[in-house]
Amino acid sequence: MTFKPFLNPEDIAVIQTEEKNSDKKQKRTPEQIEAIYTFGNNVLVSASAGSGKTFVMVERILDKLLRGVPIDSLFISTFTVKAAGELKERLEKKINESLKSAESDDLKQFLTQQLVGIQTADIGTMDAFTQKIVNQYGYTLGISPIFRILQDKNEQDVIKNEVYADLFSDYMTGKNAASFIKLVKNFSGNRKDSKAFREMVYKVYAFSQSTDNPKRWMQTVFLKGAQTYTDFEAIPDQEVSSLLNVMQTTANQLRDLTDQEDYKQLTAKGVPTANYKKHLKIIENLVHWSQDFNLLYGKKGLTNLARDITNVIPSGNDVTVAGVKYPIFKQLHNRIVGLKHLEVIFKYQGESLFLLELLQSFVLDFSEQYLQEKIQENAFEFSDIAHFAIQILEENHDIRQLYQDKYHEVMVDEYQDNNHTQERMLELLSNGHNRFMVGDIKQSIYRFRQADPQIFNDKYKAYQDNPSQGKLIILKENFRSQSEVLDSTNSVFTHLMDEEVGDILYDESHQLKAGSPRQQERHPNNKTQVLLLDTDEDDIDDSDSQQYDISPAEAKLVAKEIIRLHKEENVPFQDITLLVSSRTRNDGILQTFDRYGIPLVTDGGEQNYLKSVEVMVMLDTLRSIDNPLNDYALVALLRSPMFGFNEDDLTRIAIQDVKMAFYHKVKLSYHKEGHHSDLITPELSSKIDHFMKTFQTWRDFAKWHSLYDLIWKIYNDRFYYDYVGALPKAEQRQANLYALALRANQFEKTGFKGLSRFIRMIDKVLENENDLADVEVALPQNAVNLMTIHKSKGLEFKYVFILNIDKKFSMVDITSPLILSRNQGIGIKYVADMRHELEEEILPAVKVSMETLPYQLNKRELRLATLSEQMRLLYVAMTRAEKKLYLVGKASQTKWADHYDLVSENNHLPLASRETFVTFQDWLLAVHETYKKQELFYDINFVSLEELTDHHIGMVNPSLPFNPDNKVENRQSEDIVRAISVLESVEQINQTYKAAIELPTVRTPSQVKKFYEPILDIEGVDVMETITKTSVDFKLPDFSTSKKQDPAALGSAVHELMQRIEMSSHVKMEDIQKALTEVNAETSVKAAIQIEKINYFFQETSLGKYIQEEVEHLHREAPFAMLKEDPESGEKFVVRGIIDGYLLLENRIILFDYKTDKFVNPLELKERYQGQMALYAEALKKSYEIEKIDKYLILLGGKQLEVVKMD
């Protein structure tokens, strides 16, 4: 059959015009049409976020099919397996649609064949394709087609460590042993083992594997920097130019600053100020030295230049004008710090070259021996397979030609995340002019997987400058987000991203534009919000130790806004997504959302199975059974819900003997043979007896039964499986416990038997900071999503919260003793012995670690690459939102503006600032403050802790999937159902007379309140209808020295203090302080009493003053006893108590009571103690036969003292 020909540029222009004039609701853009139909040359499509790149790719493939190109003549590479599956689904749908409209039978037959061929076509990841090549042609390299992939990191580590150990031993005894030892020590620091060196070897090996030819890179590039940058003349010209530019920029910024209105140039007498003269001198010198550099210094004089600059500029980074600090000298300081010592560095740097050659030799030998071991095992890593495939195509012209002839077009999605191995594969498969590449350098966020955005960037610049090499098409219309999201994203990155940081200039060609009229509609309520927790408050810990965690207060801030969206704007939870930087350290979010009833599901990427509480409890149970002398595990088991020992119980057991293991202390307590056996109460003795019998049963059972049976015996004996089933997230918890039993069973089926081996395997996994995959359960549909920014790439969500924007970027790599560059090779910190330099004869050595010049150059390159990737990560996160975007962090409301008021450079934040800022928040606040006169389309709002109380946040009404009170529905056994039916009949009778049945002879007012609350409704509230949401709190006992104050102890001390104060007509602070010394309490408890509040009570409140005036009528700490009658049984009982104080007047009594409870709303305490105060009033009324009794609560537990009158 005859197919339609491919379109030429004129034909494409006609389609673009027709599309523009059509009445389609959603029109294709001219650039999309161009990307779909352009033919005959390489095409690079730079597709901004939400611009429809997948649509373009599918339409282009379909157009190829309709023009007679079979699906198996296309090579289509996707970034993930999931993306490949989605692409196939879309293609199937499109082909089916074309089948329905096809007019000829031949076309229908052809399209049907393509529909069938989709599943076997080359549509998938590069890893999958390279496996296919090696399976088919691996014989040319001697590779068996029946190989397996080494995906288990633990298995990889075992083989690698064995190879490394053997090779290390050989080098330690080889001819260069002395130099090798020096090499190892150079990377070991203060450590006395070679683990640090091993980590460096593995790092170099992994880096080399990301190149298209690891061996060639190691031989030709690895030492390039070390061999090149050996003296001043070898310093790259661009580095010198960069330094001179920084000098010019610093001078210009300082000049702009001195011209500011607030800058004080002259004194009152009209004479230039000392600061102004100093700054003018700095400007003059920096300009002069940079302009006449070659004449004054040259490359050989760089050290002198660095010293001259150091002498003329201040030691600090900032210049302060009108109270605002400007980091004018920060970048210049950073650039000259390494130059000042270059003479010394060059003197010793040469010594490191031989060591690096030795390292090169070691890594090459390791790579070869590791590969040979994998060949013996016939098991390979993905990188091995990729390199095999490249080798096959490079060394076999016929095979390469076969593929090049086969493929009409070589297509790749997410091109910005390609690494050099993948790029080489694409080059080998292409005929040189049939590549179609789709991507967006602004979304390149996989550098940690060795992706190199410069591959995309080089193509972009080449096609932009020379269209004959390929066609560059830019898709900038966004079809995802409302204008509020697009505008705020543009306003941020217009001032942030350029080629220096970000790798591309975010100009008009890259700015996002709404692709439809619907998106251009304005919704002022959806303006992007930066929500910041105000860290001016003392309660918030803003220390570096907490900088990676999302604080509970930040989580509350998010919860508050989500509850508002849900209740006030009817936003379903499933429309809301939280984005975080990493999969770990998100416990604060989970706990906070659980507390406020917000349903939350994670993306499934978190591997925290072994860290889930219920699994940790079981693992500690198994550890204790295996080895009872494991104190940590045993205490955890005792403290767990299985046995319920509290801290007091554990302390009583612990002091039975100081030196013994805890298990022996338990046994001493069991036999009552310890040093303090009198402290073992009958109740505790019963607990210990029960534990010892159960525990010994488990230990005996473990000797003769499988792990699977043991685990289920534990579940059944202590009802632990049922217990977790009553907790929040019950399905997940029970699934985790069930999976533990299954995994133990699978472990024993592999031939490994015994509890000890299973425990060692688990501990090994944890030791290597690994985990087992989480167990999947059916997740709620209407729930907030929590996922990483990386995981969210390519997805879209209506409401997006980007959390923890104040989290610092990880810069750990730039402090490593070894930094690698793809183009310059290795740079190291060299540890030189400078004893002779210092003429030091006493010490055996004076070791100094110095950053070699290759290290300094690589470090700067790596820092910029890291910052660029973080900037692109922020871009990806912000462009996920459809309707509204939130960015959440924490900062000081009073200090932030001064910190970020910068001088603009070419409509961008100064490069110095962008290089030194280390959080998303820094960038956002700096843009907002520096360009505050422009419309930036995002607001900054600070939230205080006072706005994050439970009252302000609110609560989502919890809903249960079943009625927990219906026991019949929650049991399967018919016997249990019948038994429950009988018991419930009895229970109805018992419940009616519950208070009488449980009634003691004597009770306190608080206990009476507790017993009779359900039926007497003392507080005026129907307690039985109150929904109480409980949370699990399983913590190990804290035996540290830090101690929180016991509220009961504090309350008792306050009451004693109030009794001891010598009352008079004028109580002074001295009287209160004197009384405090007489209080019988610990020093820490007395220190916690806020005597200022008590003094305020007597000096400022009406009640306090009146008590002093009527001091002769005052009664304090008055005991009473009162006979009461049970309304159900008619039995009489006695209520006893002590009244804090009252004034006995002629015709009335004024009753008052001190309360130290913490509170925010005093009305809550008023409601809580209504019943207790009523009992006190009743006792006084009966004693004195006075009807009028005024009741007051004196509340000491709030920020301020409150006196509340009771009804």
Curated annotation (Swiss-Prot):
Catalytic reactions on record: Couples ATP hydrolysis with the unwinding of duplex DNA by translocating in the 3'-5' direction; ATP + H2O = ADP + phosphate + H(+)
Record keywords, A-Z: ATP-binding, DNA damage, DNA repair, DNA-binding, Exonuclease, Helicase, Hydrolase, Isomerase, Nuclease, Nucleotide-binding
Functional note: The heterodimer acts as both an ATP-dependent DNA helicase and an ATP-dependent, dual-direction single-stranded exonuclease. Recognizes the chi site generating a DNA molecule suitable for the initiation of homologous recombination. The AddA nuclease domain is required for chi fragment generation; this subunit has the helicase and 3' -> 5' nuclease activities.
UniProt xrefs under Pfam families: PDDEXK_1, UvrD-helicase, UvrD_C
Record-listed ATP binding positions: 47-54
Gene Ontology molecular function: 3'-5' DNA helicase activity; 3'-5' exonuclease activity; ATP binding; ATP hydrolysis activity; double-stranded DNA binding
Gene3D superfamilies named in the record: 3.90.320.10, P-loop containing nucleotide triphosphate hydrolases, PCRA, domain 4
Protein name per Swiss-Prot or TrEMBL: ATP-dependent helicase/nuclease subunit A
Occurrences of domain UvrD-like helicase ATP-binding (ranges): 26-482
Species this protein is from: Streptococcus agalactiae serotype Ia (strain ATCC 27591 / A909 / CDC SS700)
Listed NCBIfam families: addA_Gpos (TIGR02785)
EC nos: 3.1.-.-, 5.6.2.4
Superkingdom of origin organism: Bacteria
